[in-house]
Swiss-Prot record:
Gene Ontology terms describing biological process: translation
PROSITE patterns the UniProt entry points to: RIBOSOMAL_L36
Name listed for the protein in its UniProt record: Large ribosomal subunit protein bL36
Signal peptide: none
Length: 37
């Protein structure tokens, strides 16, 4: 899980979602998981 100021899609499988006012990226590749912090 990477914590970043700006979350971006890193591949075509990445999805940007909002969960409890937190922007997250979920992906099939676990190294691409991010959240905004």
């Amino acid at each position: 899980m990477k914590v970043r100021a700006s979350v971006k899609k890193m591949c075509r499988n990445c999805k940007v979602i909002k969960r409890n006012r937190v922007v997250r990226v979920i992906c099939t590749d676990p190294r691409h998981k991010q959240r905004q912090g």
